[in-house]
A protein has these predicted regions:
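Carbohydrate-active catalytic/glycan-binding domains of CAZyme proteins
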Residues: 1-355, 359-399
């Protein structure tokens, strides 16, 4: 889980949920979504079921978005042995009715009870896929999603589009939206709209066209934050990263409520707030980093480790105000020779404004405060680079 106040500096809160939290699951913890209701946070997940051998939908609950989460049921929320059951998406309407959608290559749906961990039922008999009529399936049409259901598609025809996976269900104003990965492999993002939670849907076209993202899949999420709209998706462009990495673009809805075309960029979004250097800021609040890794323990929580010479952490839009600070302090732990931390302005080898040495503290989680006077005065807004120096090949300290 990551959080932000400014859209560019993100705080790593660690992993509050693990596949092992679900006794019935043994593999493939894929896409998920979380929602809040009455002070509780519900995390809808998909995973491979040991009970049926297919994919299943589960739900975990916590008192905080940072967890810890626990399996709310001790069993799947929905498990019929099908491999279709992936990528759950959840939305709660103004009247308090919550809805769950999921599926690849078909799109399934259910009404959630107020407890958020059981299905309400009452699904139309023609759409229901279970005897209890708790789960329905959307019938794909060319008008609704650009093509019919996969088993009804004509291989000799070229359709406008086709739903594949990764649904994102939401409402804005009077319109319901279904965003989804489309086109098979490789995937782009398309969407459909309607006036009622279960349709009838109308295909609206692409949002993010097929582009060189370095990933043959895509999966999006949309939110408004501090008066701006953001489109999250994933790429494979992060050098040294494993698999997929999260990206985000700012956008504005068209006047009629439809989406504009949104393109993948290298720059991402602009900051919408500043970072206060006169308050304690966690080392795991980062805009960009090189070399370092975050770790998590019960005693400390999340911290930055695997620090070696030449590594650095960047934070953006740090506002020092009109008067310069006199000193700089960090919390560090060290069980080796230690090293130094240099503070540079605006680039990795920019102006050096502070430097402090970290020495042995007696253990990798024996935390101690280290401080140093500022070498130069600094005012205004800057990007800050924390550059680590020390013996080559040696782990320097934890931060």
């Amino acid at each position: 889980v990551y959080s932000t106040k400014d859209m560019v500096n993100w705080t790593d809160h660690g992993s509050p949920l693990d596949l092992s939290s679900f006794s019935w699951a043994d593999d493939r913890a894929w896409a998920a979504q979380t929602i809040e209701r009455n002070g509780k946070y519900y995390w809808y997940i998909c995973a491979h079921s040991k009970l049926t051998g297919g994919m299943a939908i589960g739900v975990a609950v916590a008192d905080s978005p940072t967890g810890p989460f626990k399996d709310a049921l001790g069993k799947p929320l929905f498990d019929n042995g099908s491999w279709d059951n992936i990528d759950p998406t959840v939305w709660m309407d103004e009247d308090g009715q919550a809805y769950l959608y999921w599926g690849n290559p078909h799109l399934y749906y259910a009404k959630l009870n107020k407890d958020m961990i059981s299905f309400k039922g009452g699904i139309d008999a023609k759409a229901a896929v279970d005897k209890k009529r708790e789960v329905g399936r959307i019938v794909m049409t060319e008008e609704g999603f650009g093509s019919p259901d996969v088993e009804k598609r004509d291989s000799t025809r070229k359709y406008k589009d086709c739903y594949t996976e990764g649904p994102w269900f939401m409402k804005r104003g009077k319109n319901y939206y279904m965003l989804y990965a489309a086109g098979g492999v490789p995937e782009h993002i398309a969407y459909s709209m309607c006036k009622k939670p279960f349709g009838p849907w109308k295909y609206m076209g692409e949002i993010m066209p097929l582009e060189d993202t370095g990933s043959f899949t895509n999966h999006c999420g949309v939110t408004d934050f501090k008066g701006k709209s953001y489109f999250f998706y994933h790429t494979g462009k992060l050098g040294g990263g494993f698999g997929r990495s999260v990206a985000v673009e700012e956008f504005k809805y068209n006047a009629d409520g439809t989406f504009p075309i949104i393109h993948h960029t290298q720059e991402g979004v602009a900051p919408i707030a500043t970072l206060n250097p006169y308050k304690r800021q966690e080392a795991e609040t980062i805009a960009f980093s090189k070399g370092v890794k975050s770790e998590q323990t019960d005693d400390t929580g999340v911290y930055i480790s695997e620090i070696h010479t030449g590594d650095y952490i960047k934070v953006r839009e740090v506002d020092f105000g009109n008067e310069s600070p006199d000193a700089f302090a960090i919390s560090a732990a060290c069980s080796s020779l230690g090293g130094s931390l240099e503070v540079h302005l605006d680039k990795e080898d920019g102006e050096l404004i502070a430097k402090l040495d970290v020495t042995k503290t007696g253990g990798w989680e024996k935390w101690k405060t280290f401080s140093a006077q500022m070498l130069k005065k600094v005012t205004g807004k800057h990007d800050i680079y924390f550059v680590f120096k020390g013996l080559k090949g040696s782990k320097l300290f934890n931060f």
